[in-house]
Amino acid sequence: MYLIVTRSFPPEIGGMQSLMWSLARELSKNFMIKVFADYIENHKTFDEQASFSIERIGGPKLLRKYRKAYLIDEYLKESKVNGIIADHWKSLEHLKTNKKKYCLIHGKEINHAK
């Protein structure tokens, strides 16, 4: 099983949302997948059509990242997870686990000398 931890997931529209959806959909053909995503209005109809589990986390943005990390850490205690795939380093920063982590980096997230 793999967890996908993301701040960007449909039905919200965007490039990263499409990427994370496609990644979850394709991986779910061969692996158990559970997605932890931020709450978005009108998500229920979309989520019901997915072939994998999607858990939405709401609340104020400042507190949401801590709540999401807590829920993921609790889930990891009860489940056999091979790895965690994240859309951004901020989706991983508060997790307290030694599970393998795969982080998609893009744009200006890569700091290097010019």
Which ranges hold each PLM region?
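Short glycine-rich, flexible loops that bind phosphorylated cofactors or substrates
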Residues: 62-63, 92-93, 110
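N-terminal strand-loop element at the rim of the active site
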Residues: 8-13, 19-64
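Short His-centered aromatic/hydrophobic patch
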Residues: 85-91
